[in-house]
């Protein structure tokens, strides 16, 4: 009988303790940095790796076309192109030689040494993409891109690359600067202006 009473008391104490136990009192709220992991080891979901991806599409010999448009509003920033080629200004209609689809936005291309460059935005991949085309055929030669999720704000891409012999430089809508080789598409460097310089992205 004594053993039975003792057993009942033990089980009763366990049952009461189980009901009174509050597990939340022993939980620690996990916050970033609580594990003392050095910064930069773990990639966050919103991290942008500028120029992370690359695709080469076509090989094409240099074009004989000499027209150039090297940046915003042209070489002299006056919206004037100088060319020895004669343009028939009296033509009623100009045939479309080639075209390509882009994402929504207000970006414009640059033209240099027979190639066309434009900073596009791919909504399906959430990516800024520097695309290089042949001026003569319209074939895409290469593309370098990086993931940067954005919300539509009067479209997406809205800037114009700038180009010289050794560099083509872009700046994305979120302040990501990317410098590539104009011929090969190789990444030279990238800067996240928000992270490095604490800049603010304007509404427009």
Report residues per predicted region.
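Extracytoplasmic beta-rich repeat domains
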Residues: 97-110, 125-127, 143-162, 190-204
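Residue position within the beta-strands of beta-propeller blades
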Residues: 116-118, 170
């Amino acid at each position: 009988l004594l053993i039975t009473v003792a057993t009942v008391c033990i089980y009763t104490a366990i049952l009461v303790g189980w009901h009174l136990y509050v597990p939340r009192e022993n939980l620690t709220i996990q916050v970033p940095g609580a594990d003392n992991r050095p910064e930069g080891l773990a990639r966050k979901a919103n991290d942008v790796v500028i120029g992370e991806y690359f695709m080469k599409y076509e090989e094409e010999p240099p074009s004989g076309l000499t027209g150039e448009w090297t940046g915003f509003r042209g070489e002299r920033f006056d919206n004037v192109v100088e060319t020895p080629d004669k343009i028939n200004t009296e033509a009623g209609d100009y045939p479309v030689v080639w075209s390509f689809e882009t994402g929504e936005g207000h970006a414009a291309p640059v033209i240099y040494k027979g190639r066309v460059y434009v900073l596009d935005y791919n909504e399906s991949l959430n990516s800024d993409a520097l695309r290089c085309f042949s001026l003569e055929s319209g074939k895409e030669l290469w593309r370098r891109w990086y993931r940067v999720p954005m919300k539509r704000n009067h479209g997406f891409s809205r800037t114009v690359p700038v180009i010289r012999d050794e560099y083509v430089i872009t700046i994305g809508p979120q302040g990501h600067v990317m410098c590539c080789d104009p011929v090969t598409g190789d990444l030279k460097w990238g800067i996240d202006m928000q992270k490095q310089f604490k800049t603010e992205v304007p509404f427009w």
